Curated annotation (Swiss-Prot):
Organism name: Rattus norvegicus (Rat)
UniProt topology in membrane: Multi-pass membrane protein
Gene that this sequence comes from: Tmem54
Taxonomy of the source species: Eukaryota, Metazoa, Chordata, Craniata, Vertebrata
Subcellular location as annotated: Membrane
Alphabetically ordered keywords of this record: Membrane, Transmembrane, Transmembrane helix
Listed name of the protein: Transmembrane protein 54
InterPro entries xref list: Beta-casein-like
Transmembrane residue ranges: 22-42, 62-82, 94-114, 155-175
Pfam families per record: BCLP
Domain of life where this protein originates: Eukaryota
Transmembrane helix as UniProt keyword: yes
Family membership noted in the UniProt record: Belongs to the TMEM54 family.
Amino acid sequence: MCLRIGGLNVDEFRKLLMKTGLVLVVLGHVSFIAAAVLHGTMLRFVATTRDAVVLQYCVVDILSVTSAIVVILAGISAVILSRYLPSTPLRWTVFSLSVACALLSLTCALGLLASIAVTFATKGRALLAPCTFENTELPTLAPDCPFDPTRIYSSSLCLWAISLIFCLAESMSAVRCAQLVHRLLELRPWWGKSCHHTIQASPEPLDGHDLLSCTS
């Protein structure tokens, strides 16, 4: 008889789950800030224009914000679960949020990649829609332009690249979190051991108590 979860004892499993949750919280906040900065520096000016490319930019930004919020919620839930492992409803909540995070973050990454590709293909013309220039190939400062047109192209690509990296990191962390909770739920086909719970019914923290009893 052993007191282990996926090769880890209960304390190690709790620490690993808490670290994974904290990573998700940090990544979610950074992604949210990046999406907010992108909206404040670029999208709020071009969102009023009727253009398919601009619409795609806005949809991806909204998706980024939504994904960041879900990631933060999943991270907080994982941290709470690390203290209340016996709670079955909380396990399912964290597992569902983690799967949703992985899918949303991956979708967001694909959308950001598409935005970068479209911007390169169009040379950022959609970003300059609110401004009027005699020569769009050589944009200069104009009194009727609400932003610096000489920097909008590079700034947008930089923010999209940063968001893309964090979305990929969120997706991998969410998958890791889902795998950890998957072990607690004993779901097939990845559960390799026959385990029997000795978890107390109350969701209170059980420091120093055995949570799982496994037999190979």
